[in-house]
Amino acid sequence: MAIQTSNLGYPRIGLQREWKKTLEAFWSNKINEEQFLTTMKEIRLQHVKVQQEKGIELIPIGDFTYYDHVLDTAYMLGFIPSRFSEFTSYLDVYFAMARGSKDHVASEMTKWFNTNYHYIVPEYEEGLQISLKDNRPLRLYEEAKQELGVDGKPVILGPYTFLKLAKGYTQEQFATILKQLVAPYVQLLSELHAAGAQIIQVDEPIFASLTKEEVQQAKEIYEAIRKEVPNATLLLQTYFDSVEENYENIITFPVSSIGLDFVHGKEGNLNAISKYGFPADKTLAVGCIDGRNIWRADLDEVLTLFTKLQTQVQTKDFIVQPSCSLLHTPIDKTEETHLSTELFDALAFANQKLEELVLIHSALTQGTESISNELETYRNVHHTIRSSAARNREDVKAARTALKEEDFSRPLPFEKRYKLQQVALKLPLLPTTTIGSFPQTTEVRQTRKEWRTGVISNKQYEQFIEKETEKWIRYQEEIGLDVLVHGEFERTDMVEYFGERLAGFSFTKNGWVQSYGSRCVKPPVIYGDVAFINGMTIKETVYAQSLTEKVVKGMLTGPVTILNWSFVRNDIPRKEVSYQIALALRHEIELLESSGIRVIQVDEPALREGMPLKEKDWDAYITWAVQSFLLATSSVANVTQIHTHMCYSNFEDIVDAIRALDADVISIETSRSHGEFIDTLKHTTYEKGIGLGVYDIHSPRVPSKDEMYKIVEQSLEVCDPKYFWINPDCGLKTRRTEEVIPALEHMVQAAKDARSLLKTNA
């Protein structure tokens, strides 16, 4: 029996976020291209070395990237939009696709399945010449071999998932384009095999949600590839859910190994194996350590899983691996010594997960007695945190038990509420606003750091925040915005800020993960029962409102987003944690309202990303996600206007859910998706307040008034003007002041032009 340890992917960002800092230094011309490439190589090889030292046998190569692995694949295969043809160097083209340029919009960015990682959407254009433009996996494979003596496992995104994630083609064209991918994949795999690659991981996460016809179509492509590359050892890797519905066909694919997720797809994959077995001539790669959360594994449960598998499958060859790439977890917990012992002991970041894989390998190859001490330690750790006071609050249980049906709905329907709100708020047609945050300048970040390290006092920090708030209230008034925001200068992160002020949360010092490009986030850890403590946003919001006659929005992050952007305890259902957060936010919203705040925005940008991959599981998730939002927002008076915001999603999947949220106004990120949501609204009605983002805030370019006016014009073809709002795509925290002010001026002018046209036509 052969059993090996493997990893599917390692976090890119570096232990101290060296990767992020190198990228941003290069973009701001602080280092040249040679320095950039040299530093990136050092980081890349260090990651390989860490995995080697941890005892991982099959080390992923090619999972490292300068921005995004899907973008890497698009560039490699020649999926380069013609608008970037003026750029000649690899890095210029690559980063223009990712970030846009002065004259060209970036490629669309969207969520990687149901995670908080974002990928760059490949674009297909008519006449595109698909070919292997650059065999990057080969270069990196040879680099690891030469520099470190590591015979790694090249990792590539599979052809079917790649094309399914791309856009720009019709459904009728899909099969033809898919066949065109065979030749470059054959060349890629042939060259890797010729260079000595013992096993090549081909990621096909899309397989968890395909129809039977699609899986058969994918199989034919793999058969065509296998025919040309008969000797390459391929590991077909799935993750994020089970492949239960198509398992019977998938195990007949012409590959040597198949990787299955036994964490997020455990039940479905076990059901399929018990029904159909597993081929004796293939290796089963068992995703048994959670690659998406930060908790220590239950080693007893994992070993029980292997016992069950060994009795149900024909193969004797196994690979022990995480459920997915460790991209979604922080790198190492060793710096988190400030945490309580019970919490610290319960954590496992990427490096600890690698150690867990080696422990499991030892138990499987040498017997459980070889890790008896570790097993006992793990059992004690799990018992300690399960029985902790933080996870057993009677007040939280009582509040949950007391909930009634009327706690989940507003007193009046939208149409009647909105009329009352129009009278109270006195806003113009097509009101303008922003999504919430304004630039977190170097001065803002430095001052916050000085406050946190005790260099300046609480009072000095509060005075600084008030000064920034007043400055931006005046900017907004001068620009001519209708509904203002306080700017969120006191907040580092829209989830972390609330977590720091609620019971049940804890925070890491260095628990960073990549969100998109160089943007990293440090998700809170929800380890206990969540409960309200004190007002979280009252002081800053009320202060901002005192500075102006215009309406100032209260700004909160919604319960589902706080849930989906946190590392969540895994001992109770996510629904229950979401309800706990909603009850805490409900208290805060009531305090804002009683303090005179008449518009309150509860952002849910992550509502869509939490949806299960399989459509059959959507309804259950959407039901409790919507109920969580309603629980948080439904206790306000009819005259109080509730806003929400969403971004980067396939909204057509959740239009009904958006409607069910019963928000008075929803703002939706649309500019970067090049009008896809506008097309969705052509086929369905949305008769509540809505703002479709008129410019992409993720790019440094300042869009013209005419660009924004065009989006407004297109939007008004499908939206009722009396309910339509005009706003940017997202918050402006990451932009510079000199980018924000002219962009908002152009936006307000576009709104004025649109109002004038509507009045003329009327």
From Swiss-Prot:
Biological source species: Bacillus cereus (strain ZK / E33L)
Residues that coordinate or bind 5-methyltetrahydropteroyltri-L-glutamate: R17, E18, W19, K20, K111, R519, C520, W565, E609
EC number: 2.1.1.14
Xref: CDD domains: CIMS_C_terminal_like (cd03311), CIMS_N_terminal_like (cd03312)
Any one biological process term the GO annotation gives: methionine biosynthetic process
Residue numbers binding Zn(2+): H645, C647, E669, C730
Designated name of the protein: 5-methyltetrahydropteroyltriglutamate--homocysteine methyltransferase
Function: Catalyzes the transfer of a methyl group from 5-methyltetrahydrofolate to homocysteine resulting in methionine formation.
Catalytic-site annotation from UniProt: H698
Cofactor, free-text remark: Binds 1 zinc ion per subunit.
Lineage: Bacteria, Bacillati, Bacillota, Bacilli, Bacillales
Cofactor or coenzyme needed: Zn(2+)
Similarity section: Belongs to the vitamin-B12 independent methionine synthase family.
Listed Gene3D superfamilies: 3.20.20.210
Protein residues bound to L-homocysteine: I435, G436, S437, E488, D603
